[in-house]
Amino acid sequence: MSESTNEDSGAGRSSLEENSNGQRSQSEEAIAEWRSSEQVENGTPSTSPPYWDIDDDDDFGSKPSQLFGKNTWTIEKFSDINKRELRGDVFEVGGYKWYILIYPQGCDVCNHLSLFLCVAHHEKLLPGWSHFAQFTIAVSNKDPKKSKHSDTLHRFWKKEHDWGWKKFIELPKLKEGFIDDSGCLTIKAQVQVIRERVDRPFRCLHYKYREELVRVYLGNVEQICWRFVEEKRSKLGRLIEDKAKWKSFCAFWMGLDQNSRRRMSREKMDVILKIVVKHFFVEKEVTSTLVMDSLYSGLKALEGQNKNKESRPRLMDTEESTAPIVSVDKDSFALVDDVLLLLEKAALEPLPKKEEKSSQNRTKDGNAGEEFSREAVERDDRRLTELGRRTVEIFVLAHIFSNKIEVAYQEAIAWKRQEELIREEEEAWLAESEQKGKRGASEKEKKSKKKQAKQKKNKNKGKEMRKEDKVRTQTEEREIEKEECVRAIAESSAEKPDTLGDVSDVSDSVDSSAEILQLDSEDRESSPVHWEMDASEVHPPSAGDTSRGRGNSFSIPNGVAERKGLSTMDDSSSTCSNDSIQSGVANGSYKGNVLNCQSQKWFSNGKIQPGKVSDSNSLASEKEHQPSRLASDPKNQSHSSDIRRVGEADIVISHIQKPESPKERSPVSKDPNMIQMKEKSAAVLSPSRAAPWNPPSPVQAKPEKKGVSNVEAVPNRKVISVKSPSSHHASPSREAQLQTVGPRADIQKIASPKPVEQPAPPMSRPLSAPIIPPTQAAPVISAVQTSTASLARSMSSTGRLGSPTHSQAYNPQSYKHAIVGSSGFTHPSSQSSGTSTLPPYSHPSPISVSNQSGFPINVGSWDVSSGGLLWTGGSSSTRDTTTTISGNHKTNTYNAPVVTTSIRPTNVQIGRTAQSLMTDEFPHLDIINDLLADEHGTMDNSVYRVPQQFNNQYSYHGGADLGISSRSRSYSDDGFHQSYGEYMPHSASSSPYGNGQTQSQWQMANMDFSLPAMRNQDDVSASATATYSYFDLDSSNPNLSGINGYRDFRPSNGH
């Protein structure tokens, strides 16, 4: 039907207006006729479909037929009413009381009739009350087809207790048949209270009220249902049209087992029906009740198919139903066939066509007298049932597919994709791991190569270090062998009868435990040391005392001795044999300052130049308990100085001692670059041919190979030579001449080779043996001495002899010339000195003793003449011992140096001179010396007292007379250009001892310096061989100790 309803709500009232554009097609007369046809006289049975008028047992509460009611209100003399509003009588429907409210002049509007359905006594209802109802209000017309009807669905509650239309109908139209001839207006109301459900579709309308609404709203219901079905079919159609997705879905579905398919093809009814109610039932929509009734009927039809219920014969005969898709199995919906086939059927099968046939009352000009067709009503009911069933089936199929099957399919696709992603990630991870492994292997290989290179480098470095150590050890061994060879050659050369002037080294080590020979008067008288010897020789330390000896170092003054000859005596030589000598060994360390200096005498013919004197320390300052050094270390070689005197000619040869640092005590740790080079220089004298004499030595040095030590860097070397006045007349004052000598090759050229011979056994030669002088050999060797400028504790000489040595002819000498010297005495001599390279050394104990003035320290009275320094207190044949003491002097009188450090006893070994040197040439020298002593008088052997006692005990070396060739140590200082010898007083007594013995031990410190037991000076010839002894505790009576007249050495510790 084409009648439309316009609803306007305001102020709790509803008004129904007649559509002015003619949309209300059914006249009141037609409606009245249709309405009257429903109410068949005498209760004619209804012709509704079998499922429409059935209230099932499962429906709870009141049935729709019980909730439906009607009411008719007739208003008389409507035109005469001047009231604003009128209320109708109260009636009850569905358990609630209702009434009709009208506004004859309109509610908030003019020229319109306003109609409302109200809840009676709403103010008395309980709070929270509500009534959900669908109602229809109609104004009757004389022509029933022209009657005015309005339908609506509303929920009444406290604030909305009335609902209707403000503009139900215009007032002028009421005169067109709505008001009858008596002036009465009839209003009719139909109310259907709804008991809604949310879990499943439910029955809403009474069948009679539904039949009335179906004729009007059937098209709206169809439109709603087909819209939903088309939506679901289109979705399924898109899935089927997508071939790839459909193929994938088919593969997925075919891959499932039967149980999975069956389980996925079923769903609970409650789940689906809840969704159906929620989707289709909408409040404020008048057709919602009809849709819900349609779904309810369709659900009942599905359930009835499964129960094989037979419907009424007339329905079955007239209705042809389509093939079912969904079946009801107990409380579940199940797909009747395979899901693939059902999807294709639902998507491709067309829907039933809409009926073009409309109601007979739909046209405004319809015949009023036409009877209502029962068949039309039944057809509409069947159509609503089919719409409901089809909608439920599509809904169930769509729900099962969308919520179960498609979800499983999407999960499978997602799982597969996830597996692919995982596989891709694993492959990427494996590739990355492989790359990392390659990088790690590469880095590891690099590290390994680097480590191997480092290990190889360290290994090569270790090999190089071991090679260097091996080379250094071999070098040190070779140097030691060379030193031993040089030492052995020197000893062998010194002991040869025809080469009397060999010098192997400038260092003479004086050992504290060296054998000291005490000569008695008889031995000294027959000693050949008293014979004049025109030779210069420096002996190396013997093999027995090289490992213990530590000597002083002295230097050669830079000047030329202009005397006629040279004479050398060896203080350590003796004519006694080994059997008659008892050697005393001094063990232990000595505390205190020990001035172990060698008595020297220095006569200079020329003027000494102070500017060429190098400052140095002559005595090494040693600490207490200093261990002995090995003699193989060149730095431990002590250098002695000898004074040769023939008449007025005196030559001073001093040697330098380099103190040893604690780091250089072991010969193994010695730096190869600092190996001390020893060179052998020989001064060939004109000796008389005599039997060889060897000094006693506990260990005979074995000569190995002859050569000169190799030196890497040799500083400036100075060649020292002595010129004889017979060939060259030198001026009284002569400058030192420096000659720089080349390295190793030049030195080896200078050094004269000497054959190695086994020394003859030591033996004493009788004085009466005849001596045949040998032929003189021309000397060709000059001495080379090297010194380093970095020596911190060396005592350098005042100058260097600048004239080179040259050969001289041998001239026989007289006894006079042999003693006092003359111009005719031209005994050739060559000066020799050892060569040593001394590395810098700094000792903590500073001793400042240097020589600048060049004057010797002389204890006797002396004066300076043009010929040199001459003694004024005695004749030229007198021997004197000049001792220089540098002690702890508190006064500075005579400009003496102040020494504040303790000096250990320094062992000085005096070079040995071959005894046959002067004995062969002057066999009666002792007798001549005695005669000369009677003529000139004997010079006092002065024993001096220092003005201040030393801190500890000291013993002087060479305290006895030295004869013609005496030794002197010269000190020079930067600021004191005078002799220190004047500081010490003389002793006037020339013969302090009465027993004829000469004192060999000097008492120091607390000892008595009066020397009550000094030997008589008469024995002049024997005093030159005085031996030196060290500290002897039992020195009060020197004559009591000893064996067979020789002195017994006692150390200071009493052992």
From Swiss-Prot:
Residues 447-460 have a biased composition (Basic residues). GO terms for cellular component: cytoplasm. Disruption phenotype: No visible phenotype under normal growth conditions, but the double mutant plants traf1a and traf1b, or muse13 and muse14 are extremely dwarf when grown at room temperature. Residues 37-46, 569-586, 723-740, 823-845 have a biased composition (Polar residues). Residues 502-513 have a biased composition (Low complexity). Keywords: Coiled coil, Cytoplasm. Residues 441-496 form a coiled coil. One of its GO terms (biological process) is autophagosome organization. Pfam families: MATH_2. Residues 433-446, 461-486, 524-537, 657-668 have a biased composition (Basic and acidic residues). Functions redundantly with TRAF1B in the regulation of plant immune response. Contributes to the turnover of the nucleotide-binding domain and leucine-rich repeat-containing (NB-LRR) immune receptors SNC1 and RPS2. May associate with an E3 ubiquitin-protein ligase complex, which modulates ubiquitination and subsequent degradation of NB-LRR immune sensors to maintain their homeostasis. Functions redundantly with TRAF1B in the regulation of autophagosome formation. Required for SINAT1- and SINAT2-mediated ubiquitination and destabilization of ATG6. This is TNF receptor-associated factor homolog 1a. The gene is TRAF1A.
